[in-house]
Amino acid sequence: MSLILALLLQVGPNPLSGGLPDDTLVRDRPARSGVPGEDGSATSAWLEQCFSQIAEDPARAHTMAQIRRNETKGADRVLANHCLGTAASELGLWEDARTAFIAAREETPLDETRARARFAALAGNAALASGDAEGAITWLIPAEADARAADAAALAALAAMDRARALVMLKRGEEALEALEAATTLAPERSEGWLLKATLLRRLERLAEAQTAIERAAVLAPGDPQVGLEAGVIAVLTGREAAARASWQSVLVLAPGSPQAITATDYLAQLGDAEETAAREEDSPPS
């Protein structure tokens, strides 16, 4: 048991690591208020084509967007950079993605705060994915501020979550927790914020609070294998091995063959069989 405890406390599942652009950020189109009707329709059609091309051939979409960016201006150029950044993200070209999203933000009118927030968040996320935590924070702070100004709570929460990830990378755990408090306040219905909060609290050894957060995540996303994995880790660290076993076994049912299932299988093997678990719990003093 002590070996498992040490292993899980140090490692465990880590949804706090740098991530990829959230689909709600990528797919939500920026405003085109300055584009006349006919041109707006053409712009919209081009953007749909470019996004469809990303799914089929991201390298070709990347080239299409580069050409479009170089040949256009105004709203057309903003949307070309949007697609360019998304294609670059799909290809793992994080610096290209960051540059494109920053350009899209800088060319978006100041009064279109929601679009500017989105592009800043995407730039920050690209920086995070490349391992540049400081660079990520540079863009995630204005992303959150602009999203709040636009009354876009979900978008502000996403920026706060990525800011928390960046702060964890910089070993600034308490600041990261503040960011996650903001995220769960802004978007209490999103399970991801509660999962990240539970994971960070567990790593800070604040296990009672971690349990509360993971229970909330489980209510919001009962079918999320990452939630089940984290719930099991918190359970074993608080001496509830039977509960940990149940959580990890649920991961095998929810997502067989997934990375989470592979991790759960490894944890279950370390835990031993059910009879050994029951015997250990009977021998343990009440908490």
Residue ranges and their predicted role:
Residues 43, 78, 117, 154-157, ...:
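Helix-start (N-cap) detector for alpha-helical repeat units in TPR-like alpha-solenoids
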